[in-house]
Amino acid sequence: MIRRHFLTTALAGQSLAAQRNPSPGAGIFVEKAASGTPHRGKTLALVTPHLDDGPIFAAGTIAKLLKEGYTGYLIRTSNDEKDSFDLTLGETVLANERDTASMIAALGLKQAFDLGYRNHRMDDVAMIELRGRLIFLFRLLRIDTVFSYDPSGHYEENPDHYVTAQAVESACWMSGGKLDLPEHFAAGLKPHSVSEKYYFARGPQLVNRVVDIAPTLPSKLAAIHSCKTMVTHMVKDVNASLAERKLRLPALAGAGEDAIRQYTSLVFQQRDAAAGQRHGLAYAEEFHYIGPDRGLEEYISRNAVPL
C-alpha cells in the first residue's frame, strides 16, 4: 500500500526513522552477508497484505538469505484492489496480480500464494480463518523463517497490516501443535513450528536486529521497481499534491519508468541509507527479530547420547 508520507519523511531528514531506535547500537545484532550457502535447505515466507510491503521493508534481507541458500515464498493476504491511481477496482486487482509475478521473479522467490481478502477490509476477516490458512501453508512449505509486519507495532493505521501481523504471530506458534487442525495430518502434513521471525514496522519499533543490505541493494530496488502499479500511484499522488500548490518536481515528471526510478532512489534508497548511517553501514534494514530458543539445543548438544 501507499506508504504514509514517504516522500515528506525522506525530505524531512527521516525524522520518523529516528524514533525507531533511540539508542543506536544498544542490544542490537548486526547481521552481515555469510559466505557460501549456509542456509541451504531452509525455507522462508514473506507474509504481507500488500505486494509492495516486503520489497520496501525487507527485500534486501530476503535477497541476502536467498543468496545464502534459502528457498522463498510470498504469501499475499489481500487482493490489493485499492492501490492504483486511476484504474478501476477490477483493473487494479489484475495490474497488481501481474506485478506480483514480476516481483517474485525480480527477487528470486519460488512462488506466490494469494489469499484474496478484500483490500482495506481485512478487519472484517475472521482471525481463526486467516490463521488456519497460514498454518496450512507453514506446514505445507515447512517454513523456517517468516518476514511480516510487527504484531506489536505502534500507530498502525492500516487494518490489513495489523490483522495480518497478528495472524502470522499466532500461526507461527500453532503450526507446531499436534492438536491444532489435525485434519492436516490426514492429508500428509506434519506439525512444523516457525523458528525465526523478522518483523518490520512503519512506525516506532523495538529494533534488535539490523541487516547490512549494501550487497543486495540492487535486488531490493529491482523488487520495488517491479511493483509498477503501486509505485506509479505514489508518484502520481505526489505530482497531484504538488500541482495543487502550483509546484512540480522535474525528476518525477510524467510518472514513467524514469520517474519510478527517481522516486525509488529518492525515497526508499535514502531511507535505507539513513538506517545504515545509524549503525555504521552504507544501507540497512531494521527489524524486531525473534529467534529460536537456543538454551535447550545447547543442553542437548552437550548431553544427548545415541539411542
Predicted regions and their residues:
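N-terminal secretory signal peptides and thylakoid transit peptides that target proteins
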Residues: 1-14
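C-terminal accessory domains and tails appended to enzymatic cores
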Residues: 7, 27-31, 38-40, 177-193, ...
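Boundary at the C-terminal end of the N-terminal hydrophobic targeting segment
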Residues: 17-18
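Active-site rim/loop-helix segments in enzyme catalytic domains that contact anionic ligands
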Residues: 21-141, 296
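Structural signal for conserved beta-strand scaffold positions within catalytic alpha/beta enzyme cores
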Residues: 46, 76, 114-116, 148, ...
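Histidine-centered active-site/metal-ligand motif
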Residues: 50, 158-161, 227
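Internal alpha/beta domain cores that form substrate/cofactor-binding pockets in large enzymes
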Residues: 73, 112-198
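Residues on a specific face of well-ordered alpha-helices
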Residues: 98-102, 165-166, 170, 218, ...
